[in-house]
């Protein structure tokens, strides 16, 4: 665990709030390369904090981290340009993990098709198969526009929340 992620864990233990960096100018379309890079880096740090919470069996931390990640995506116009966070999640979590479900849904509904093609070699094989099956099921029922709307409507806490019992 790198020092900054450990520092964020200690901060959460004492304050019960997730430390994160607000990225300036995320609402500008398209975001600058610098803004995009900062956004990618901050989301990766939050993903690492979620994984640390998973390893330490800290579901409240994991759930608060997910709330912050979702807020960052809702506030900004950035899309994750890097794909390293996806492989990181797949390498560090188990099949069926709540964060894997979140990542799968994000890639299906929010990632541009050209970006997926460009980086398909970076995506875990089981993610690609799962995405294919989910997307086919959804697209058969709805068109593209309604599918995007559905993603936004379906972002409910129960999809990614870790049970706290």
Label for each model-derived stretch:
Residues 1-29, 136-140, 144-165:
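BTB/POZ (also called T1 in voltage-gated K+ channels) oligomerization domain detector
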Residues 39-45, 59-164:
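Alpha-helical protein-protein interaction/assembly modules
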Residues 1-64, 70-75:
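Canonical BTB/POZ domain core
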């Amino acid at each position: 665990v790198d020092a900054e992620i450990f520092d964020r864990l200690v901060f959460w233990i004492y304050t019960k709030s997730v430390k994160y960096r607000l990225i300036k100018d995320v609402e500008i379309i398209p975001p600058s390369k610098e803004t995009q890079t900062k956004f990618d880096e901050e989301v990766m740090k939050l993903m690492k904090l979620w994984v640390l919470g998973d390893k330490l069996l800290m579901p409240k931390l994991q759930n608060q981290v997910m709330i912050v990640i979702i807020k960052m995506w809702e506030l900004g116009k950035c899309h994750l340009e890097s794909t390293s966070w996806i492989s990181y999640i797949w390498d560090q979590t188990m099949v069926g993990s709540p964060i894997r479900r979140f990542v799968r849904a994000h890639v299906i509904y929010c990632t541009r098709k050209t970006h997926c093609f460009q980086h398909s070699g970076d995506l875990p094989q089981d993610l690609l198969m799962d995405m294919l099956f989910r997307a086919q099921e959804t697209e058969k029922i709805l068109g593209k526009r309604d599918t995007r709307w559905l993603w936004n409507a379906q972002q409910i806490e129960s999809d990614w929340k870790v049970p706290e019992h």
